[in-house]
Amino acid sequence: MTVVTTEILGPIAILRLNRPDAMNALGADGDGEAVRAACDALNADLSIRCVILTGEGRAFSAGGDIKKMADPEGPFSGGGLPIRSHYQRNIHRIARALFSLDMPVIAAVNGAAIGLGCDLACMADIRIASDKAKFGVTFLKLGLVPGDGGSWLLPRTIGMSRAAELFFTGDLIDAATAADWGLVSRVVPHDTLMNEALAMAGKIAALPPHSLRLTKSLLRQGQTSSYDQALDSASTAQAVSHATEDHREGVMALLEKREAVFRGQ
């Protein structure tokens, strides 16, 4: 069974973490390569305009696989250098692949998002939570540190003070608190989660694919660039956008008072 599955619904892709018997825990050998391959395939498909990331079963992701951490022969054994290598070629490959998706990503958080699972949700651009979802970064309770980039992601999502509170206490928060803290955009009844995510993805997917990808790139660059650098990148992306048929279609649709039909040209 592959750790991730992809379902294509026209311009929308649903990426499902697929280890429900272990609450979609990650860290087995090969997980990084499987997620990277799935994300590379989506990036190469210009017909995909939006991705929904969710979990199979009752959890989004419980994070790292505790049973494998306890296994003396497992991937987290062998001392410092082998463990460092495992993180870089496996856990970090998962993180880099999801963070590097070119199109907008919606995390549909259907249950527990703990540790790495919470950080995976933060890699999405938009997060919608089921009212059954819960969030936490419990690394310290295992004698660990956030090893997947969470110390970079979470403060940028909810601010340094809230992130520090979650990291230093190991507390879990419910979906309502996550919404109050800005970790998720909205909370919806559990049974409507995927319908809500698909509705939002449909809105996004109706927009020009090139402009969507360029805008996501600008948002990502804006997290680390100066304002002058952001302006320079924006002018380049805008020059590309002005040359597209989709730009002309958007202008004409507005002048003609009709809905635009963007074809990715």
What residues fall within each predicted segment?
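C-terminal alpha-helix plus adjacent terminal tail
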Residues: M1-A13, L46, F60, G170-A176, ...
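Conserved CoA-thioester-binding segment of acyl-CoA-metabolizing enzymes
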Residues: M1-E56
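Terminal peptide-recognition signature
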Residues: L15, R19, A34-V35, L53, ...
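Glycine- (often His-adjacent) and acidic-residue-rich active-site loop
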Residues: A22, G55-A97, A113, G143, ...
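Phosphate-coordinating loops and pocket residues in cytosolic domains that bind phosphorylated ligands
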Residues: A25-A28, A62, D71, K141, ...
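Non-membrane alpha-helical structural segments and their capping/turn regions in soluble enzymes
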Residues: D29-R36, S85-Q88, H92, D191-M194, ...
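Crotonase-fold acyl-CoA enzyme core
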Residues: A41, R96-H210, A243-T244, E249-M252, ...
